[in-house]
């Protein structure tokens, strides 16, 4: 993966797994039984998200780096 998107990983008691969200890519998220598994799955889904957007002719946001919160 050459794009550096922010990935937020948190524990979900409801899903009993770690959830990885990619805020810059709408709907891009993954999960895993471990933190590392969630991260690996997120990296894979980012690539798939970009491939799908490219095939559909949709714009691909550039990574913004670290998101700032007020």
Protein language model regions, located:
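Short aromatic-glycine-(Arg/Gly/Cys) micro-motifs in beta-strand/loop hairpins
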Residues: 10-25
């Amino acid at each position: 993966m050459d794009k550096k998107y922010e990935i937020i990983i948190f524990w979900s008691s409801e899903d009993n797994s770690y959830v990885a969200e990619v805020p810059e890519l709408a709907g891009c998220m993954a999960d895993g039984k471990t933190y590392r598994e969630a991260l690996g799955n997120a990296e894979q889904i980012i690539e798939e998200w970009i491939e799908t957007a490219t095939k559909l002719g949709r714009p691909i946001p550039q990574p913004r780096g670290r998101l700032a919160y007020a």
